[in-house]
Every structure is written in C-alpha cells, then in structure tokens.
C-alpha cells in the first residue's frame, strides 16, 4: 500500500476554491504513483483532512417484548436514524457510520446481537457528515481523474481507529 501526502493548491480554509488546480495536483500525483507501481488505478478509498466533517451521535431503540432480534430490526433502525440525519441537516451527506454502542436489555453487548432474545434493543451510532457541495466537488475531481471513489473517510477517524486497534 502506498500513502502520499501532498499539500494541495486550490483549497483555502477547507473549501475548494479552484477545482482545476486541485484536479491538476491530484492527477499529477496519481500519475507518479501509477508509474512508480506500474499499475493503473480504477478506484480509491479517500482519506481526507482538508474538510470540516460534522459528527452527530444518535441512539435508536426497538422494543422486542421477549422476541428475537433480527437483521431486519437493525436495518429498520439504521434506516430510520439515517432518515433523521437527512432531515436534521439537508445540506450534508453521510460519509461514514460508526456503531459505538449496542445495548440489549440495558446491558452493553460487544458485537451486534442478532439472534439474541430480549425486551429492548438500543444502538448508538455516530454519523460523519460532509457538506454536499464539497462532496460534489470531490467526486467531480476524481471523476476527471477516471477514479471511482469507493469510500471517503476522515483522517482523524482513521487515526483514532488505528489507535484503538493497536491498543487491543
């Protein structure tokens, strides 16, 4: 895996101010990496720290009344929380969702408790959001580079996840 960090021109105060300069800088760096590795990239996972991400934590719950927690229950809960996010902040898009806590009958569970029986299931989720226009600009730049973005992540989130993983 290759990592490259290059100061970008055309970005000021976390806003793309010149899409052509940003595209030129990124495409030149991609070309150099492709030449060095002798490959042509078709898609990418983008880790960025030049933009201001918003973070919203929400909890959702499902009354089970002694029944089994099913995948459909969790899917419904996730979709309803995503809908809440889109109603709360229509100018931003969800970039990443992180499950931070699972509770079954008020007891913390380490893994998704699909298949377990209980009376009440609750889940806390953290939503990372990015401004819609910033997101459109990012996609436009990488489309011009003939790269499909598979995922966008915040650099601070990735560093935090690595720190947690290295400590366990």
Label every PLM stretch briefly.
Residues 1-43, 48-168:
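Nucleotide/phosphate-binding catalytic cleft detector across ATP-hydrolyzing
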């Amino acid at each position: 895996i290759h990592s490259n960090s290059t100061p970008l021109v055309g970005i000021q105060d976390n806003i793309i101010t010149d899409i052509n300069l940003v595209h030129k800088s990124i495409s030149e760096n991609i070309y150099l990496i492709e030449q060095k590795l002798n490959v042509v990239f078709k898609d990418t996972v983008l880790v960025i720290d030049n933009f201001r991400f918003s973070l919203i934590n929400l909890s959702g719950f499902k009354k089970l009344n002694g029944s089994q927690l099913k995948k459909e229950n969790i899917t419904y809960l996730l979709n309803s929380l995503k809908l809440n996010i889109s109603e709360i902040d229509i100018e931003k898009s969800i970039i990443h969702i992180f499950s931070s806590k699972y509770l079954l009958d008020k007891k913390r569970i380490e893994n998704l408790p699909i298949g377990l029986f209980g009376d009440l299931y609750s889940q806390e989720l953290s939503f990372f959001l990015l401004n819609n226009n910033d997101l459109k600009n990012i996609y436009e730049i990488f489309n011009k580079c003939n790269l499909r973005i598979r995922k966008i992540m915040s650099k601070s989130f990735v560093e935090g996840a690595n720190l947690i993983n290295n400590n366990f």
